[in-house]
């Protein structure tokens, strides 16, 4: 056996008594093998004879990428988008969410998200639903935001009929048993505890900045169920909400990777004339309130000294988010605001996936590169059908909170100043790149189709959005920033807030020419 191994080793190495075998793999033989065989003299730039000519996608023929929309007799809209491949993503998007809970117990949308894909009239349990989807290689998910609830399934296109039937049952025929509600109560309670303990404060700060910006109205209502309401929400409360907001005229059945007519036929079969589990009484208690921006401050004092992701503790930080009202996604200024947000950019001290992303954005150049003690500085833009919020999140040591806030207010003031052509073009290119790369994903296309059709009854195609981005000029960015700076700020603060400036001082800084905070005088140091 040892002799065989030794022989094989020598053969592979080409040494010893087997050295002559190397001639078989020498340069002349290798060149003959790789010369092209039957096509030795045809350059790569010429087509091979007898080989079918490949057909490539062209940039023209936009009709192939148009979103088709059909409205059924009951008001439900069916939207579809072609995408090649054997899998599809189909779902139902509903115009409901936490912003519509003013007349209800806050937290209903959070409960419904956790209750999704539980037992229904046709399926006895969540396991049965998952087994049905597995036969078509499918997965399911439900997400709620402040203004939209989305039930989605990705599966083999051949199972479209089964998928739409399942979605209709999940949305319109949920059982909402006492056991399921109790299990959901525990899941919601756990998520609230996790929200308050997780090292990443961004979800909590986003909740707080909305609460400060829109005091007790529409998008300022709690997205997560308040602790005091967890025990109060039951089947009757859920049915009361569903009766008003889960109506066909507030729904869109969207699909990507499916034939439009097939999807419409499935919608007529499973979503037309269906009696929902909560009855078919008229929706009489719909909240049609328009968002009222108020500005203000939300503070949460907390010991952040023992927060860690593992054995290595994170430095004790104070987190600040300062925001101003922007505009709705239905307005023309939405695109300039999106470019402005990309121009501000920013990030953390450490970037996942390698350095280089946004390193020439303003918050990197002016903040993170110049102030080593700043742990994070990132710009965010939240936009809804009747309002919007552009904000900057910053983190630093509690002893440098005042200086950090002043740096952020200065950056807000600089937004209304001169816009360099190079940085604007870079931001526009980054925004276009991000848009197109995200839309390579089927679930993202599905969400884009569904949300646009739900909000506007049509869809702007990617090339139209790219044209709008290219047309943004420096004066457009300066105009929207100057308009934004005339409003009241919204402030969220988390951590050790001993040195946090007052709301009035922050407001004064944002109204000044240089963004400086008013000087404070102390009798005793």
UniProtKB/Swiss-Prot annotation:
It holds the Pfam family Peptidase_M16_C. Changing residue 377 to T: In SCAR2; impairs cleavage of FXN; does not impair cleavage of DLD, NFS1 and PRDX3. It is found in: Mitochondrion matrix; Mitochondrion inner membrane. The keyword Translocase does not apply. Ubiquitously expressed with highest expression in fetal tissues and adult brain, cerebellum and cerebellar vermis. GO terms for biological process: protein processing involved in protein targeting to mitochondrion. GO terms for molecular function: metal ion binding; metalloendopeptidase activity. It comes from the Eukaryota. The modification N6-acetyllysine is found at residue 299. The modification N6-succinyllysine is found at residue 64. Transmembrane segments: none annotated. Keywords: Acetylation, Disease variant, Intellectual disability, Membrane, Mitochondrion, Mitochondrion inner membrane, Neurodegeneration, Transit peptide. PROSITE patterns: INSULINASE. Residues 1-33 form a transit peptide. GO terms for cellular component: extracellular space; mitochondrial inner membrane; mitochondrial matrix; mitochondrial processing peptidase complex; mitochondrion. Signal peptide: none annotated. Heterodimer of PMPCA (alpha) and PMPCB (beta) subunits, forming the mitochondrial processing protease (MPP) in which PMPCA is involved in substrate recognition and binding and PMPCB is the catalytic subunit. Belongs to the peptidase M16 family. It is linked to Spinocerebellar ataxia, autosomal recessive, 2: A form of spinocerebellar ataxia, a clinically and genetically heterogeneous group of cerebellar disorders due to degeneration of the cerebellum with variable involvement of the brainstem and spinal cord. SCAR2 is characterized by onset of impaired motor development and ataxic gait in early childhood. Additional features often include loss of fine motor skills, dysarthria, nystagmus, cerebellar signs, and delayed cognitive development with intellectual disability. Substrate recognition and binding subunit of the essential mitochondrial processing protease (MPP), which cleaves the mitochondrial sequence off newly imported precursors proteins. PANTHER family: METALLOPROTEASE, MITOCHONDRIAL-PROCESSING PEPTIDASE SUBUNIT ALPHA. This is Mitochondrial-processing peptidase subunit alpha. It comes from Homo sapiens. The lineage of its organism: Eukaryota, Metazoa, Chordata, Craniata, Vertebrata.
